[in-house]
């Protein structure tokens, strides 16, 4: 019976994802989800409180369950590659859910998962450079980094996913995080021209 329950929950999640990709989140109703899944409306409420909970569950099931497992195995780079790949595989869906704003925004859900992923990473590999910056503690650093990753994913999906592959977006993200803009400015040549 438990297996059937898991299959029903997965079916509801799959139909939710398909419908969001086609119609968008705001126009989607619980009835539309249950009709697509071939179940009655009360069945939905056996698994989820509302469509926001489906969105959060899918983020965990489809992406962060596996990403977190890799993080726990101290395979940080693989987990980052997987994160970008998973978003790339379902980019139409993720473009649509990034439009969900307000109290239960997708962006906030994603931020919490990314922050947790980074906490796991730091648990295995403590930060070393914050000693020179006493006003920036580990939490502030991780929050800033999580915001950067979430916004990087959002920008890529909404603006550039048709032009930039998941692998290239991941490489670009790594490059941006390892170089400051000051490292990239051609200041020496500008000064020579003066």
Language model features: what each stretch is:
Residues 103-130, 136-154:
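Amphipathic alpha-helical packing segments from all-alpha helical-bundle domains
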Residues 1-23, 27, 32:
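Basic, helix-initiating cap at the start of DNA-binding domains
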Residues 38-48:
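Short hydrophobic/aromatic patch on the recognition helix
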């Amino acid at each position: 019976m438990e297996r059937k329950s898991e299959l029903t929950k997965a079916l509801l999640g799959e139909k939710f994802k398909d419908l969001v990709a086609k119609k968008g989140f705001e126009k989607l109703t619980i009835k539309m989800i249950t009709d697509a899944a071939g179940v009655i409306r009360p069945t939905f409420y056996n698994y989820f409180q509302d469509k926001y909970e489906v969105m959060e569950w899918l983020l965990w099931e489809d992406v962060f369950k596996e990403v977190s497992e890799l993080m726990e195995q101290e395979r940080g780079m693989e987990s980052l590659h997987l994160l970008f790949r998973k978003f790339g595989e379902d980019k139409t869906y993720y473009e649509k859910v990034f439009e969900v704003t307000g109290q239960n925004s997708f962006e906030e859900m994603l931020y919490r998962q990314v922050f947790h992923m980074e906490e796991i990473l730091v648990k295995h590999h403590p930060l070393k450079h914050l000693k020179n910056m006493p006003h920036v503690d580990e939490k502030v650093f991780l929050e800033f980094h999580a915001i950067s990753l979430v916004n990087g994913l959002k920008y890529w999906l909404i603006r550039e996913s048709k032009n930039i592959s998941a692998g290239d977006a991941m490489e670009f993200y790594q490059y941006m995080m390892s170089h400051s803009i000051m490292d990239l400015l051609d200041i020496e040549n500008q000064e020579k021209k003066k």
